[in-house]
Every structure is written in C-alpha cells, then in structure tokens.
C-alpha cells in the first residue's frame, strides 16, 4: 500500500507518494520533465513493502506547483534545496537517495550537502563537473530538448520516449508529465550550470565517504558509459559501475525485476 499527499515548502507545494514499509527511508528523485510515477515498479515491488519508499515531484513537475521563485529553484542546486526543504518539512532526518537522470545530479548534491544522506544511487547520471560535459554525455537529437523552454506535443512525446527507452510503450502519464513541466526550468537550469551554481559531481563522487552506486543501461542513449568508468570514486558500491546489458536510460522501468534485485541488495547492505 502507498499513500500520497502534499507538503508546503519555500519552493512550492510538493506532491509526494510513500509506501508503508517499516524499514529505513529511501528518497526517489525523477528526471527532467518526468514525474514520480516513473518509480511505480519499485514502489509496487517487495522493496516497497520492506522499506519506506518516498518519491516526490520536483517543483514545476507532475502534481507539484511551479516554483514561486524560478531563479532560486530551477537548477540542480535549487532542486537539491527543494529536496532538503521537503525532507525537513516531513521530519525525515535520514534517507538513502536514489536519483535518475536529472534526479541523479540532485542526489549527488544531497550526498555532499545533506547530513542525513546514508548512501546514494544514480542511474542515467554521469557524475560530471563543468569541464566534463562534452565527454560525459553522448550527442543525440533529444539532448537538444533537454534545455528547450517549450515543448510541442511531438517534442514531448520524443522526450518521454527517449527517457522510457526505445521500443518501450509510453504510458499516458509519461506524455502528460513532459507536457506539464514548467518549461522555464530547462533554460534556467542550463544557465545555472554555465554560471557554476551547481556543485561539481565528479568532485563529489571522488570525496564523499558514503556509498555511491552507479548503475547504467548498456544501451544508454544519453550518458557516455566510458566516462562513468573513468571517474575516480571514493566509495563506489561493489567497486564497479554496474552496466545492465540491453537496457536504456530508465532500466528501473524497462526491466524492473533485474533492476530491483540489484537495488534490493544495495539497500540491504547500506542500511545494515
């Protein structure tokens, strides 16, 4: 069973869903122009029965409100501020953080900034600094949409399909989430990155003492998997980058059983 609600923060009204598992808290953070429903196949699994899984819609996404101050919120750093505000408002003092794509960059900031971060897991996310951007990502047509302010329905469909995976049937809410996202956040997020407002993900990966799991699809269309293995990590879980053969940008949706088995082992180990 899961329950949903809304929490007021200085970054807007945050929509969330959580399971009734009695184990430690696990915070899930979705990607660019997506929504918390992306993690449904984890919430409905045995993991959701054993752990308190919490997913929220980033400001300007899903059922959350748009940010009242877009310049303060619509960046990786600002989304991390919003996540911390949400956790504080909910009275959550410790959590494992699981981030996908943009959410993975937010998870890295939490790893560095929020004392309650027990461990972090990133998927579809290169732990990159500003100087790494040209090599951390693969060139693709959809990368051009990442920072575009407004989507046509065709562009929203393309963005949602690329996120879900080639050949993966799109759920209606995936397209709706891409259409709903506050388009102001995309160029503002790019501007913040250019201005150096976000923390250096590569530096975080190399210095954070908490366990960091790095998991990627073997057919990842956006992230350069060779870059992932070139990064120096201080505490890389399992001592390696996990590559899930044949899967794309959202392996947790595309092949939930395979993904969940790995996530379950990670959670069991880092919360002992």
Language-model segments: residues:
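Alpha/beta-hydrolase fold catalytic core
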Residues: 1-28, 48-51, 92-93, 240, ...
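Active-site loop/oxyanion-hole signature of alpha/beta-hydrolase fold enzymes
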Residues: 10, 54-98, 261
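Conserved HGGG/HGGXW glycine-rich cap/lid loop of the alpha/beta-hydrolase fold
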Residues: 12-66
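Conserved alpha/beta-hydrolase "nucleophile elbow" surrounding the catalytic nucleophile
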Residues: 30-32, 95, 99-104
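Short N-terminal helix/helix-N-cap motif within the alpha/beta-hydrolase-1
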Residues: 36-41, 63-66, 105, 223-224, ...
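Conserved loop-alpha-helix segment in the C-terminal half of the alpha/beta-hydrolase fold
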Residues: 46, 209-247, 253, 258
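Flexible "cap/lid" loop of the alpha/beta hydrolase fold
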Residues: 105-108, 112-150
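Conserved alpha/beta-hydrolase catalytic His-Asp/Glu region
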Residues: 132-133, 149-207
């Amino acid at each position: 069973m899961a329950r949903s609600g809304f929490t007021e923060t200085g970054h807007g009204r945050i929509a969330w869903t959580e399971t009734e598992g009695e184990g430690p808290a696990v915070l899930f953070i979705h990607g660019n122009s997506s929504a918390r429903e992306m993690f449904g196949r984890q919430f409905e699994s045995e993991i959701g029965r054993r752990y308190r899984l919490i997913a929220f819609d980033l400001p300007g996404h899903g059922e959350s409100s748009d940010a009242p101050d877009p310049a303060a919120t619509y960046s990786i750093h600002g989304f991390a501020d919003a996540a911390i505000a949400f956790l504080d408002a909910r009275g959550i003092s410790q959590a494992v953080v699981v981030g996908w794509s943009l959410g993975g960059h937010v998870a890295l900031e939490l790893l560095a900034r929020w004392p309650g971060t027990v461990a972090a897991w990133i998927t579809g996310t290169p732990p990159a600094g500003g100087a790494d951007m040209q090599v951390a990502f693969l060139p693709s047509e959809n990368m051009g949409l990442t920072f575009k302010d407004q989507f046509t329905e065709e562009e929203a469909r393309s963005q949602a399909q690329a996120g879900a995976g080639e050949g993966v049937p799109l759920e209606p809410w995936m397209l709706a989430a891409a259409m709903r996202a506050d388009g102001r956040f995309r160029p503002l997020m790019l501007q913040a990155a250019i201005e150096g407002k976000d923390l250096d993900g590569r530096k975080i990966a190399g210095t954070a003492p908490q366990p960091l799991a790095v998991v990627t699809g073997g057919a990842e269309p956006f992230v350069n998997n060779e870059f992932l293995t070139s990064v120096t990590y201080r505490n890389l879980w399992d001592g390696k980058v996990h590559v899930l053969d044949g899967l794309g940008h959202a392996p947790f949706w595309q092949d939930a059983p395979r993904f969940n088995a790995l996530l379950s082992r990670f959670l069991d180990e880092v919360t002992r």
